[in-house]
Amino acid sequence: MNIAICGMAQHDKSEVDNFNGEIWGLPWDEGRWPFFDRYFEIHPLDLLRKPEAQRRDGYEDRLKSLPILYMQEAYEDIPNAIRYPVEKVVDNLGLDYFNSSISYLMGMALLEGADKIGIWGVDMADLEPVPGDPSYISEFAYQRPNMEYLIGLARGRGVDVYIPERSPLAKFHGEGIPLGLMYPSYPQRYGYL
């Protein structure tokens, strides 16, 4: 089974269009939603209904219109919602470690025995706009290590995981790593100039 996992960062849509397998994504990614085979909305419905969730008007109706939608529960108000099998996924992974919606897609792909997983639009770029700026933090600072762990777990199980070259996922970033009072730039791997 081949699975494409699509996030919302810029990516080459033609690569996804040419992917031979199921395409999974997020329901709030409305620019590309018509071609997803499965959707995952892991946030609890009571939180999604709050204005602070910043979901657009009619978002709940959108959820009701999706063909295959995984949520925390099979909500009565969302009749097409399928309960995400979190216990089975955790048992399969051996660890209850999810720091993003995308990580739940990876967990499901591993549970279902994917042979190949392609990951597009999932950069989780936690880099500061100005290197060394300690005031900058993003949610990706804790989401990315989780995703990279799941990528490593998948590869350790023999799953072919494709990550586009332009994505920073599972790639070394050699800027801003201090050595005493210096900040050397390592081009390919830590410690090597």
Where are these regions (language model features)?
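Metal-ion/cofactor- or nucleotide/acyl-coenzyme-handling active-site neighborhoods
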Residues: M1-L193
